Amino acid sequence: MASDLKSKFLHVYQTLKSELLNDPAFEFHHDSRQWIDKMLDYNVPGGKLNRGLSVVDSYQLLKGAELTDDEIFLASALGWCIEWLQAYFLVLDDIMDGSHTRRGQPCWFRLPKVGMIAANDGLILRNHVPRILKKHFRGKPYYVDLVDLFNEVEFQTASGQMIDLITTLVGEKDLSKYSLSIHRRIVQYKTAYYSFYLPVACALLMFGEDLDNHVEVKNVLVEMGTYFQVQDDYLDCFGAPEVIGKIGTDIEDFSSWLVVKALELANEEQKKVLHENYGKKDPSSVAKVKELYNTLNLQGVFEDYESTSYKKLITSIEGHPSKAVQAVLKSFLGKIYKRQK
């Protein structure tokens, strides 16, 4: 069933792409159509597609029955809107961070003929979302709520990115700016809203629910998103590269839960080691930081955090009156609890 759903989901991508390449609001010529075609294929469908597929999964769990072809198409279209939004964030994020690779291939802006055209491509990706929503949801009673939801989540994500950028200004490796509360705010706004809340909120709207009645669901999903990012930081340092599929850079980079915890637990001498070595790319500095993490037993600290977070999340989920909503939230948690990559 899962692979069948994924193939249907990918088929919807082709349909949406074809519609966008023939959007009557713009007079395409061969070169521009070819550019958009290549840009979309390079940036939109390349990831794990978890966010997009979660809309379909969540809607199915809310409905509690087989979905019609029309429902699969609409839930998939909303899922793809999230993947489009994600592509827009990543294309611009990579330019801001000066990154080299994304999903195992060069970042879009690193391609010889792309460069800073990628900034405009990011804007086009962002503007495709309302085009898709208008074409397929304009007649739905929840259309305005959908548009509002995407606008709000985009604002929250961009604001989270801003806190991250101004806290970790390149060249100003100032650990004193960093604390658990700042880390939490960055994660909440930059990751949790669009990765965890948005897919479920889309499914709830499509199911006819009023999001104002589901503030508790939002809170649980934001907590889940925070837990997911802490896992990510942990795996970046302690996960096996062949399992996580990338080489960790958090000791060289910056905003990691591990360094925040280390600062909290370290004595003055250990803090000095951190301040002198954190954020540097040379292997000896990275090794010193990792050695300090081991001395502070951050693996044990993370395991405690993981089990406490899990128990709190389960308690919150089981307090929800709707069994269908519980199933949606438990399905999300099941995908990430104790993951290795």
Curated annotation (Swiss-Prot):
InterPro entries the record matches: FPS1-like (IPR039702), Isoprenoid_synthase_dom_sf (IPR008949), Polyprenyl_synt (IPR000092), Polyprenyl_synt_CS (IPR033749)
Q: Which UniProt keywords apply?
A: Cholesterol biosynthesis, Cholesterol metabolism, Cytoplasm, Isoprene biosynthesis, Lipid biosynthesis, Lipid metabolism, Magnesium, Metal-binding, Steroid biosynthesis, Steroid metabolism, Sterol biosynthesis, Sterol metabolism, Transferase
Top-rank taxon, per record:
Eukaryota
> Which pathway is it part of?
Isoprenoid biosynthesis; farnesyl diphosphate biosynthesis; farnesyl diphosphate from geranyl diphosphate and isopentenyl diphosphate: step 1/1; Isoprenoid biosynthesis; geranyl diphosphate biosynthesis; geranyl diphosphate from dimethylallyl diphosphate and isopentenyl diphosphate: step 1/1
Residues binding Mg(2+) 1, per UniProt: D93, D97
Q: Which CDD domains match?
A: Trans_IPPS_HT
Residues binding isopentenyl diphosphate are K48, R51, Q86, R103
What's one GO MF term for it?
Answer: metal ion binding
Q: What does this protein do?
A: Catalyzes the sequential condensation of isopentenyl pyrophosphate with the allylic pyrophosphates, dimethylallyl pyrophosphate, and then with the resultant geranylpyrophosphate to the ultimate product farnesyl pyrophosphate.
**Name of the featured protein:** Farnesyl pyrophosphate synthase
The gene name on file is FPS1
